[in-house]
Design a protein with these regions (language model features):
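Catalytic and substrate-binding clefts that recognize carbohydrates or anionic sugar/phosphate headgroups
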Residues: 1-33, 43-44, 56-61
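Aromatic-lined carbohydrate-binding/catalytic grooves of carbohydrate-active enzymes
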Residues: 28-168
Length: 168
């Protein structure tokens, strides 16, 4: 017989003592990369690779510090529908685009959602392989403005194959 639940109580005189005990048990976090503490540039969205290139070139020309350029939903094929694919009309060469930014000293952050929409290209594959946990309409609308997108489910990151699929 195996126990269904292990209960661990960590005591200490101060909160730091308790946290140290917790970290001793679970492990200490690694330090994020230095660039992640730097300056991030973003706005509601950029709508093309040309627009991003112009802004990034100007920041370098005018000696503004910037480590990360963040692209909001404008990189999507359909605004607000996260399918993890670039709109190739506005971003015709995604690899080249990101390569240019990296060469110019930028890291690139892309806005994403861990949901799959009913009309997303990936929905059939996600359902067939149990990569998503079903999402009720109530769950999709509670405190969110994404209900109009008709999300079918959230990616089940507790399932290793779903995590690998998402990374791919």
């Amino acid at each position: 017989d195996q126990a269904l639940l292990d209960v661990v109580v960590i005591g200490g005189d101060t909160m730091e003592d308790i946290l140290r005990g917790y970290r001793d048990l679970t492990g200490y976090p690694s330090m994020p990369p230095l660039w992640s503490f730097g300056v991030w540039m973003s706005r509601m969205t950029y709508f093309s690779a040309n627009e991003v290139d112009e802004i990034c070139d100007r920041m370098r020309a005018e000696h503004y510090p910037c480590d990360v350029i963040h692209l909001d939903t404008g990189w999507f094929r359909t605004d607000w529908l996260c399918e993890w694919k670039f709109n190739e009309e506005r971003f015709p060469d995604p690899k080249g685009f990101i390569g240019r930014l990296k060469k110019n000293g930028y890291r690139v952050s892309l806005w994403q959602l861990p949901y799959v929409a009913e009309n997303a290209e990936q929905i059939d594959e996600a359902r067939a392989n149990d990569y998503i946990a079903p999402l009720t309409k109530q769950q999709a609308t509670d405190g969110s403005n994404f209900s109009a997108l008709d999300y079918a489910g959230t990616i089940d990151f507790t399932y290793p194959k779903a995590t690998e699929w998402y990374k791919g």
